[in-house]
Amino acid sequence: MSKTAGVGRLGGARAADAAQQQQLAAGDAAVARAARPIETLLRAAPLVLCVAAMTLMLRDQQSNEYGTVAYSDLGGFKYLVYANGLCAAYSLASAFYTAVPRPATVSRSWVVFLLDQVFTYLILAAGAAAAELLYLAYNGDKEVTWSEACGVFGSFCRQARISVAITFGAVLCFILLSLLSSYRLFSAYEAPPPSALGSKGVEIAAYPR
């Protein structure tokens, strides 16, 4: 009788654990459904910012008695245009991807995480390069006898400054997306159990001293 009772208690505990896991899964699914519109809007926000920054930079040109200057004359500004275009396309694609309900898997979470990282660093590098160009345009560089240019081409510099500021707004959005995708990836999926590593476990190389 005691053995039968023990088996019954074990079966009841397993059933309770299974029910608890189902409740947790249902709760996670409800949270995911509620958070999907918010994440979709967050992923669409860089699209607006990147298109605005790219448009301003593409139209940035000034002519006066000293000559003509355009964004295409400076490599850093051209890089900013290309980076904003690529990030705008990714923002649109990721917003559509997030808006469509689909089961979350480890592989999909990894893909989204890696793409978020790549485009975050891409737009950050573009903003930093353009900001450095603006600094030189406003202040010059006495060590290499570069004079400042914004005193002559003030309108060009002001429009470029607005474009760079909007780009850093997009950078902030991509940083938030990177944090979100990394949290989803590393909190929802646990490390593989020791049995999945094989009978030998993890082998660590030993180097001679």
From Swiss-Prot:
Stated family: Belongs to the Casparian strip membrane proteins (CASP) family.
Query: Which residue ranges are assigned to the Cytoplasmic compartment in the record's topology?
Result: 1-37, 101-109, 183-209
Keyword field: Cell membrane, Membrane, Transmembrane, Transmembrane helix
Organism name: Zea mays
Q: Which residues lie on this side of the membrane: Extracellular?
A: 59-79, 131-161
Coarse class of the protein's main subcellular location = membrane
Write down the membrane topology.
Answer: Multi-pass membrane protein
The record's GO CC annotations read: plasma membrane
Question: What's the protein called, per UniProt?
Answer: CASP-like protein 2A2
Q: Quaternary arrangement and interactors, per the entry?
A: Homodimer and heterodimers.
Keyword Zinc tagged: no
Superkingdom as given in the UniProt entry: Eukaryota
Entry-linked Pfam families: CASP_dom (PF04535)
Q: Where are the transmembrane segments?
A: 38-58, 80-100, 110-130, 162-182
Which residues fall in a coiled-coil region? Answer: none
Which compartment or compartments is the protein found in? Answer: Cell membrane
Kindly list the organism's lineage.
Answer: Eukaryota, Viridiplantae, Streptophyta, Embryophyta, Tracheophyta
Record flagged with keyword Membrane? yes
